[in-house]
């Protein structure tokens, strides 16, 4: 069994608990669907938020999705001038037999600008929304 990393990010419109949890769930569900893994396959998950987000821990969203036995870790991004604001980033490490090249990284909403080189077309997403 190999350990592989899956990256993702999403932006929120405001620093409030409900939106942070909702958008984090959206990203987690998308990453799980696109990479077709089971919760039992997850080694650990890291969440980071930009310094302007402090109303909630993104890991709470994972616990609400029944990831309660997965090691979860929240952290704050470094405050780089000019970086994308109100952004939640995720790194999920999973056990699988896939190659790293087969991992589908998902960058949603305003975060689509971050890593166009890693993005795959998300199922059901229009091509115009992807770019």
Predicted regions and their residues:
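Terminal domain-initiation and capping elements
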Residues: 1-131
């Amino acid at each position: 069994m190999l350990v592989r990393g899956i990256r993702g990010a999403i932006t929120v419109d405001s620093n409030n608990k409900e939106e942070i949890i909702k958008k984090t769930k959206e990203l987690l569900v998308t990453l799980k669907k696109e990479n077709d893994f089971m919760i039992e396959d997850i080694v650990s998950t890291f969440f980071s938020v930009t310094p302007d987000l402090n109303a909630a821990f993104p890991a709470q969203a994972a616990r609400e999705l029944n990831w309660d036995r997965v090691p979860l870790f929240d952290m704050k991004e470094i405050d780089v001038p000019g970086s994308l604001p109100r952004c939640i980033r995720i790194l999920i490490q999973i056990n699988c037999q896939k190659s790293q090249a087969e991992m589908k990284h998902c960058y949603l909403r305003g975060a689509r600008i971050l890593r166009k080189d890693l993005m795959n077309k998300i199922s059901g997403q229009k091509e115009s929304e992807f770019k």
